[in-house]
Amino acid sequence: YEARPSFTFEKAVDTYNHLLSAAEAATWTLSEIEEHAASKEEPQGELGIAYASLRHREWLSWQERRMQQRNKWREFFESFDVVLLPVTLTEAIRHDHSSPFTGRTVQVDEQKRPYTDQLKWVGLTGVSWLPSTVVPVGQIDSKPVGVQIAGPFLEDRTTLAAGRFLQEALGGFQRPHGF
């Protein structure tokens, strides 16, 4: 059974990336914003400085896109209580604290991907302000794997209840070997 809202994953993630970068830029000085706006550097991992220098008019356009996606999620949840989604692209990984953030990579199926790709699935729901609950559902090579349970706006208890049901069905949390 495939349940999907009536917008593309790519469109939702693009909206998330633009709005997240613009929000991060709120802590920058005016000279930093101007420097980034003048930069010809392309966004790295679909998330980068080029998005951070949005003009207010552009930001409003991205906000409108967010609201349209929220409406499509609302329509989706008229037929479904929750939706199950990945949390990230892989099982749990060792955290990388090297700098810069946009230069980090993660290995996915023997291919290096931008570290920021790990944000895509939480961005899909987060950009529309949907509650989500993450529960462990198994392990790969002794590393935990989780599932994201997303639900309608302001229905946090729905996702928590679904998480409890799923945990009961799967036998609860199993501590990975070595932890």
Where are these regions (language model features)?
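Gly/Ser-rich, acidic/histidine-flanked active-site/gating loops
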Residues: 1-16, 50-53, 58
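Short low-complexity, flexible loop/linker segments enriched in glycine and/or proline
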Residues: 12-21, 99-101, 148-150
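Short helix-loop capping/hinge segments that flank enzyme active sites or metal/cofactor-binding pockets
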Residues: 18-74, 90, 95-98, 134-144
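Structural helix-boundary/capping segments
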Residues: 60, 79, 114, 121, ...
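Glycine-rich, N-terminal phosphate-binding loop of Rossmann-like dinucleotide-binding domains
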Residues: 87
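Short, surface-exposed loop/helix-turn segments at secondary-structure junctions
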Residues: 93-119
